Every structure is written in structure tokens, then in C-alpha cells.
Swiss-Prot record:
InterPro entries: Cyt_trans-like, PPAT, Rossmann-like_a/b/a_fold. It comes from Clostridium beijerinckii (strain ATCC 51743 / NCIMB 8052) (Clostridium acetobutylicum). Reversibly transfers an adenylyl group from ATP to 4'-phosphopantetheine, yielding dephospho-CoA (dPCoA) and pyrophosphate. PANTHER family: PHOSPHOPANTETHEINE ADENYLYLTRANSFERASE. This is Phosphopantetheine adenylyltransferase. The record marks 17 as: Transition state stabilizer.
């Protein structure tokens, strides 16, 4: 069974993230969306909330599992009994960062493989940071995130 782990903060999940999940689910037997827990970072949503939001928007994709993790990604891969990291790339700067991370992960565990998917053209401009910024200024985020979670984001932003 070919299992890939798609790690990220997903704060919040965007249409770009969802596109990579859907496409990854067609390539791999199973995709584990790994929601990063970093106690030193300030998130809009707690990790448990991010997990629930992702579950909501992926409920119709049978071969997707959502889990949270902290610590080293290579250790989480072992826990999941896989060696494959799935990453989405939007820009050249994403590539440079992921290229470095792939080498670091390979250094930590030589069996680790990183598979990169190019973002769909319609999603290249979307990031979680952009979504939060647009929402904070009262902009329309309907083309940026799944419709099912717009109210969650807007109510959290407007606290």
C-alpha cells in the first residue's frame, strides 16, 4: 500500500491544500493529512479545530485520514509506516524551501522520499496567511477556502 503524508499547519485549510489532497488521493492508496502542532506558534485555530475543519471538507474522500502531530516529521512517518512526504508547490520560493527540507529529512532518515505536486494554476496565489489577511479586512474569501468553513473563519476572525 502506497501511503503519503501531507504535512502542514492548515490554519486554515485552503482550496489549494484541498486540491493537493484530492490529487494526492488519486495517486496514492492513502493520504494522511498531518496537522502540525507547534506550541511556539500562534494559530487562528487550535490543532483539534484544524483537524475537524479538514475532516469536514474531506469527508467524501475515502482514502484520506486526518491526524495531528508534533516533533520531527520523519518520526511521524515511521509512526504511519510510510516513507513518503507529499508537498504542494506554488512558486519557486516554495521549491527552494521544500528542496532544502527534503534534504534535511533525507539526512535524518535515508529512506524518506519527498513527492512534490505543482499547484493548479487557479490556486497559485492562495495561502493560509492571505486568507486570514483578506478575512481580517472584510474581503470575500469564498474563492480561497472551501465553502463549508467560511463561516468558521469569519466568526473566528471577528472575535
Amino acid at each position: 500500500m502506497r501511503v503519503a503524508v501531507y504535512p502542514g499547519s492548515f490554519d486554515p485549510i485552503t482550496n489549494g491544500h484541498l486540491d493537493i489532497i484530492k490529487r494526492g488521493a488519486k495517486v496514492f492508496d492513502k493520504v494522511i493529512v498531518a496537522v502540525l502542532v507547534n506550541v511556539d506558534k500562534k494559530y487562528l485555530f487550535e490543532s483539534s479545530e484544524r483537524v475537524e475543519l479538514i475532516k469536514r471538507v474531506t469527508r467524501d474522500i475515502e482514502n484520506v485520514e486526518i491526524r495531528s502531530f508534533d516533533g520531527l516529521l520523519v518520526n511521524f512517518l515511521k509512526e504511519c509506516k510510510t516513507n513518503i512526504i507529499l508537498k504542494g508547490l506554488r512558486t519557486a520560493s516554495d521549491f527552494e524551501y521544500e528542496f532544502q527540507m527534503a534534504f534535511i529529512n533525507k539526512e535524518l532518515d535515508d529512506d524518506t522520499e519527498t513527492v512534490c505536486m505543482m499547484s493548479s494554476a487557479k490556486n497559485i496565489h492562495i495561502s493560509s496567511s492571505t486568507v486570514k489577511q483578506v478575512a481580517r479586512f472584510g474581503g470575500d474569501i469564498s474563492g480561497l477556502v472551501p465553502n463549508e468553513i467560511i463561516s468558521d473563519i469569519m466568526s473566528r476572525i471577528n472575535l
